[in-house]
Amino acid sequence: MENSVAPFVLYSGTEPRTPGEDSLPLPAEEEGAASTAQTPCSLSASLCFSSGDDSPPQSRASAAEGSEASPPSLRSDLRVVETQWDVSSAASPESPEECARPEEPASPEDPPSRHEHARPVELESLDELGEPVPVPPGVGSVHGEPDLVIEVAGRRLRAHKAVLAARSDYFRARASRDVLRVQGVSFTALRLLLADAYSGRMAGVRPDNVAEVVAGARRLQLPGAAQRATEAMAPQLSLDNCYEVLSAGKRQRLTELRDAAYRFMSDHYLEVLREPAVFGRLSGAERDLLLRRRLCTGRACLLAAALGTTGERSGSRPQSPSGDAESRGDAAVYCYQAEAGEWRELTRLPEGAPARGCGLCVLFNYLFLAGGVAPAGPDGRARPSDQVYCYNPVTDSWSTVRPLRQARSQVQLLALDGHLYAVGGECLLSVERYDPRADRWTAVAPLPRGAFAVAHEAATCNGEIYVSGGSLFYRLLKYDPRRDEWQECPCSSSRERSADMVALDGFLYRFDLCGSRGEAQAAVGSGGGVSVFRYHCLAKQWSQCAVHLRPPGAPAGLQPFRCVALDGTIYCVSRAGTWRFVPSQDTEAGSDMGPGGSFEPEPLGSPLDVRGVLFPFVLNLPEKPDRGEQGAV
């Protein structure tokens, strides 16, 4: 078997070459050994090449010039030879060939060598990123210089391991690393998250980047940061971007973003309902969720609106809208604070809202005010108003909706099946219905001719509207929205003046003031009393609950009051006091014997120094401490 010997290529030279010109120098102690091992013939080492390359020998300068065109493998071999030459000639003065040695790849596309990875790089600190990052006092002195380099998206940040490890399991598990490469997180999101880790305050979050910040907080296991980012973004939500935030939350399965978008849509339900680009793109389940949140969030509270004296009937008919408008100084909404046992002002009626003769009701946990007596015009005469105002208790703000088709005073405003109904008015039989999604009023079946000039009381029960009124005798009318028609209902045997009518558990409860017409004054004394009747809406029968009841603590001359149902109890609110009437459920509905009922012994009091009539209603108020504490009334 023959031994393979590398071929030798000989080139004739005109003169001997000295080390340092075209050949690589060798150390003195290895020079003899090298010549013995690498020169098997009598020729000089500069003329012998033991490689298999057939190319002629090159000088150091030519090798540097050809490094750009050589493959990476050849250039890496040349780099090793050059490094050995640097070691051998470290003590010698710098030669021209050293200046020609390339320090970096000539092209940006060329990959860096092993030695270039080891070169120190200039890293960006948190304070060099445009906006200063709030750092708690003492962090720098306690932890010293940053000891962690975080690489993301081709950029680097410096931080302290101890700070990040204390707030994230992700960084705690990688505390041994000095350089940490993070994937799946943008540089902007990482910068905001690091600033939050140092300061505990999330700044710079917007609806267009909140998704990547929350996703980055989850990836880096910063649970508190995700919630703080959502809270910082929430005030920036609007009708223009709420659906995009919701879509991003659903697409990336970010619960915090979904909840924030749903919360905004629920808090601004009417605006979302009128916006087809938002409400029209929601599924049926999402629409039900928004309405459930709107109706169930918060705590149901007893409220009362103090309106002008026009709404208080001294006789069978309310006052005419003619005459000067009264002062609106007392036109406000009060909330009963059960913990403190007192009424406190919640909000005041907006500027321009009629405080006399208007109707009010609650729809979608909004308070609506419609109609009334407008302030006197240039001629000094007051006229009915067609304005409609809306109060949102969640945002504590008033707004206007589309006006009525016809101006009305002494109007009855009711909410039924997601619509508003404006029934009658003084000397009016027409009825209008408001669709909040279309923001439009339309006419429906009017009251029957000859019914009554003014509807005194109105209530909704079992999906129908009941209206009571009349001067010489009372009539009870029922409106069926499915048939769009009015029907006559049986009336009670009482001929007393009615204070109010309210619906509860399928019944209509009517409160009459005894002795108001001089019939039962002798029986109850000079102070009078209250008789309660109820009407079973399905059986169409009246029964008597109580006769000549005296509200506890009521003054000698019982003033008219208004009623509202809350938690199975009927609250009777007036300027003289607030009483709770609890109907008894012992007797079956429709029987000849009344079910009974009584007032609770402890009255709740009433707002002090309030003129006009108190119209009670129920709203769900958000759970906020000290809400409405502008001052005890």
From Swiss-Prot:
Which Pfam families does its entry note? BTB, Kelch_1, Kelch_6
Q: Where is the composition biased (Low complexity)?
A: 61-73
Repeat positions for Kelch: 317-365, 366-418, 419-463, 465-506
Q: Does the keyword rRNA-binding apply?
A: no
Where is the PTM Phosphoserine found along the chain?
70, 73, 92, 95, 107, 113
**Top-rank taxon, per record:** Eukaryota
Instruction: Note whether Phosphoprotein occurs among the keywords.
Output: yes
Q: Which UniProt keywords apply?
A: Kelch repeat, Phosphoprotein, Repeat
Per UniProt, the ranges with Polar residues bias are: 35-60
Domain BTB: residue ranges: 146-206
| Residue ranges, annotated region (Disordered) | 1-118
Q: Which PANTHER family match?
A: BTB_2 DOMAIN-CONTAINING PROTEIN, KELCH REPEAT AND BTB DOMAIN-CONTAINING PROTEIN 11
Full protein name: Kelch repeat and BTB domain-containing protein 11
Species of provenance:
Mus musculus
